[in-house]
Amino acid sequence: MPLTRSKSLPATENGGSDRETLQSGRSVAGILYKWTNYGKGWRSRWFLLRDGILSYSKIRRPENVNLLSPSDDLRLIGDISTDRLLRMKSCSGRSRRKHHKNIGIVHLKVSSYRESKSDHRKFYIFTATKTLHLRTDSRSDRAAWLQALASTRGIVPLQSINGDFSFVSPKDLSISTERLKKRLFEEGMNESLVKECEQIVDSEFCEVQEQIKLLHEERKKLLDALRQLEMANLEAEASGIHDDVYQLRNHKYSSLGRGKYSECSTSASSDDKQEFEDISEEDEASFHDTKESFGEPDVGSVLTHFKRRTKLPDPAEKERGVSLWSMIKDNVGKDLTRVCLPVYFNEPISSLQKCFEDLEYSYLLDQAYEYGKSGKSLLRALNVAAFAVSGYASTEGRHCKPFNPLLGETYEADFPEKGIRFFSEKVSHHPTVIACHCEGKGWKFWGDTNLRSKFWGRSIQLEPVGILTLEFDDGEIFQWSKVTTTIYNILLGKLYCDHHGIMKIRGNRQYSCMLKFKEQSILDRNPHQVNGFVEDVTGKKAATVFGKWNDSLYYVAGDGINKASASLLWKATKAPPNVTRYNFTSFAMTLNELIPGLEEKLPPTDSRLRPDQRHLENGEYEKANEEKQRLERRQRMSRQIQESGWRPRWFEPQGESESYKYTGGYWEARDVKSWDDCPNIFGEFTEEVADCA
């Protein structure tokens, strides 16, 4: 195969070079440095540009370098690429070369690029799902790569490298008939005939120009369609990559009643996993996980024929970022209890709704109920453990805080397609306590949560206080408490959260479970790990559990020595295509939705009716900030209201345990719209409201 090194290109500052190089159509390859994460920084990768597709792979071993076939004309960019390739070829014969494995691909026809203004070696490639941060060894190498990108048909430069690459608009086309007129006069034709010929040419050109205009519009539509299809097809196109990265060699994983399963993220590094997730987003509009519909309406709801939304409303205003430092500076010396954080730091759901988000994978409890009915108690306990872990999956990438509910604020969720009804209420303001109750097919779930926070300068540690209870109709009960959550890089760096600690799931019959959420370190290549076991009443391990709280969970019978026979318990749903800065899951996007006919059934205390939260969801940021300040002034009266003898409407305290239990009656009151004893807590505050409460 003819390998040539890219010579020092006669490039201008903005990357121009000779036209022959751009139009040669040769494959381009070389070593680029790719930014991975803060722990590992810049890592060298082997990049190959061919047929409009940019692929990259690790280069630890010679077999990781793709040289295509001997007939391909490959142009290498950079001295380091040539030197390293020759050195690797001398160390390993061609016969040892194995099948090439990419760890990332980029379809350039639906991508764009931009060179860095601050560093002459850096440039960026933008796709619908990610941004590649790349760096070369020199200015000339960057110019060569940018020329190669520009020569790829259809790529759109964000900062034009050379004006010749843009598509010529039909209105800029023109035609000159001077040569034609001159030639006709030379043939002896008279002026009237020449003028007639000129008119014919102009007429034909106008028709051609109109056709070009139509083709131009069609081209734009096709490019838009390609960009939309890209997100839907990336996972299918990269399925081979997915298997290569995540499949444990020679392991065959089987899921519970779902056939063979060949993916296991526990073997992949955080870098590999991130690279794959960036290029393979799943285009799935379904928000629920129950694969089988219930045969009868066990929870008292009839399935309504409507489609829940798959995206948030388009913002009505352009959001303006907020500097945390400037906000701290502006509030130095002020009473912090009266400082109102702007809605920029909030996501458009409340903590009440976030409680319901933990039930996104409620089908696990349905499965647990069925397993228990058929005498498979171990599988019931395993599914309960998977459910306890699954509630953390939605926290990945969520950088905004939910709204703090007002005292007495409520939230209902009637999801007949999932077979569940959920209700929650803020039952105390000092301390803040949220109680919830949920009914499913053959099970009930309830609990209350109070967060104790500790500020450590660069991080905030949240320790949940409260017990969650799951009771099946046959009397089997499981109880557990949530683990500690720590939010890192509050002031500087990339904000992220981690969950860590021991979760003990206690059963009142044969099995209990213990899970350890491993705390993530700065250089951890395999974060979010969960490991544990299920034991019987004698203390003997019945099954071993392992996986990641943001991705999947597996189990192996016994002590877990033979992980090759592991079975899938739970797999997180892929991120939706219509992501916003809130990083909502498809399920989370439905939580604050006012479906047709729902508003007139809700009590005036429901979170969906909270004005600042609704304005934020609609992108009306100024109104949202105004309403948030108004409601927080009202919130400061909550202690006085609570101390005056206020009691929650739908929950009652259980003795000295400081826990709350649902008293019943909400759904019955909803059926007859009996909300006379529910004050309008979101309205204008008056002393009468306090007396009423």
Swiss-Prot record:
Domain PH: 25-154
Renumbered residue ranges of the record's region Disordered: 1-22, 256-298, 600-639
Coiled coil segments of this chain: 207-239, 612-643
Annotated keywords: Coiled coil, Lipid transport, Lipid-binding, Transport
Tissues and organs where the protein is expressed, per its UniProt entry: Expressed in roots, leaves, stems and flowers.
DNA-binding keyword on record: no
Biased composition (Acidic residues): 274-284
Bias (Polar residues) ranges: 1-15
Annotated GO biological process: lipid transport
Composition-biased stretches (Basic and acidic residues): 285-294, 600-635
GO molecular function ontology, one term from the record: lipid binding
InterPro entries assigned: OSBP_sf, Oxysterol-bd, PH-like_dom_sf, PH_domain
Tagged with keyword Coiled coil: yes
Record-stated family: Belongs to the OSBP family.
PANTHER family hit by this protein: OXYSTEROL-BINDING PROTEIN-RELATED, OXYSTEROL-BINDING PROTEIN-RELATED PROTEIN 2B
Role played: May be involved in the transport of sterols.
Protein name stated in the entry: Oxysterol-binding protein-related protein 2B
Lineage, broadest ranks: Eukaryota, Viridiplantae, Streptophyta, Embryophyta, Tracheophyta
